[in-house]
Amino acid sequence: MPEINVMERGRELVVNPLVTCQPFGAMFATLGIRRGLPLVHGSQGCSTFVRYGLNRHFREPAEIAVTSLHEDAAVFGGRSNIINGVKNLVKRFRPDLVGIVTTCSSEIIGDDVDGFMRVAETELREELGDRFQTKLVHISTPSFVENHFRGYGNAIKSFIETLSREDGDCNHKLNIIPGIVNPGDIREIGHMLGLMDITPIILTDTSDPFDSPLRPSKTEQMPFYPPGGTAVPEIEDSSNSMGTLSLTMYGDEALNTLEKRFRVPGEYSMPIGVRNTDDFVRRAARISEKDVSDELLDERGILIDSMADLSSRYLFGRTAAVYGDPDMVAGISRFLCELGITPLHTCTGTDNELFIDRMKTVAAEADERINVMVKSDLRALEERLSEEPVDLMIGNSDGRLIAQDLGIPLVRVGYPVYDRVGYQRVPITGYRGAVNLLNRITNTVLREYYEPQHWKLQQ
């Protein structure tokens, strides 16, 4: 049986990284809460860098506050920074939730964030009385360990631990932990579940906050917030759901919390490609005790028909390199095998064991040996591609210069995509998303390998 060749970058220095620090993931998750604001307990750059990245990808503003730690706070602590920051946010913006996100600075100096948060709550209750309704959630995200995927998972876990309340009655809903995906993907998941008559609780829903028209507030007294997002009562009600499906491997701690504390079963399933989407649909149907609708079967049939039209003619026998988010890399790699493309090189900045297990499955199904680069970076991928080139690269915009230098066409997916527009609205999940991805891959192959010889297009 073919095996995977697991490789690490072999050096301490990271060049052109594939991951960033934990606070990014926590900020992203908090922005998916209706009238939610992240308050970053760190220096100004900790929020500026994230806002810049989100603006480039989504072309939308990201409201992120910061306690603005300076040299004095590094010595004497950031007590006043948190208390004043929370009070200013609550009084001026009246959010439903403030997620207090720690950074390397605040974690290293050992700030008692929970204690400072309680002081701020006490003072706000004294000043505002019943008008103080904001939920405060402490999210621990030390930047010097793990990555932004773990930061996202820590945020979801913190929301559940702080807010969820079990009332004993099942709400007949299905929790969905989407991970760091695009608005189009979240909407596609909602569409599929809607066809099965399943009501989801998205933990958390970043679709409308990052892709909606900006409208003024109805009254001058009501601060502006983007529409959509997961309401705080929905998070509180997540403990009464029938089950949870996580689209990210880093939703494991949130799944464990819901299962152990509230007896809500949880499973992992990322619906990219035919088999993975079949798996997602079956799990959702089993947990929710619902039937798969004819409309969903029709969407699957359209995907299979598209694959029959295109795979053997244009794609079979080609090779690809896939890099980025481990959930996306594993899902796309399996879909490539379904198309007859060998994912010869896969590269991610993490070393998640579930990712390695998934890639073993991909190698077995492809009947090919696959290079799986973990805890790696784009420099290592570039070196590998220089030695063993492929027909396609599939990943985010950070690999564009490598693709240009090596003359390999790049199919852009995931986060971030900043040198093309509209990609955040086009799903790659579900059956319809797989059709989108298939068309994108095929059109790239046609442009690169068929257009230079126009006679091939007539065959």
Swiss-Prot record:
Alphabetized, the UniProt keywords read: ATP-binding, Iron, Iron-sulfur, Metal-binding, Nitrogen fixation, Nucleotide-binding, Oxidoreductase
**Which GO biological process entries does UniProt record here?**
nitrogen fixation
Q: What class of enzyme is it?
A: oxidoreductase
Keyword Nucleotide-binding in the entry? The reply is yes
Q: Which Pfam families match?
A: Oxidored_nitro (PF00148)
Spans through the membrane: none
Query: Gene3D superfamilies under this entry?
Result: Nitrogenase molybdenum iron protein domain (3.40.50.1980), Nitrogenase Molybdenum-iron Protein, subunit B, domain 4 (1.20.89.10)
* Family membership noted in the UniProt record: Belongs to the NifD/NifK/NifE/NifN family.
Q: What does this protein do?
A: This molybdenum-iron protein is part of the nitrogenase complex that catalyzes the key enzymatic reactions in nitrogen fixation.
How does this polypeptide assemble, per the annotation?
Tetramer of two alpha and two beta chains. Forms complex with the iron protein (nitrogenase component 2).
How is this protein named in the record? Nitrogenase molybdenum-iron protein beta chain
| The gene coding this protein | nifK
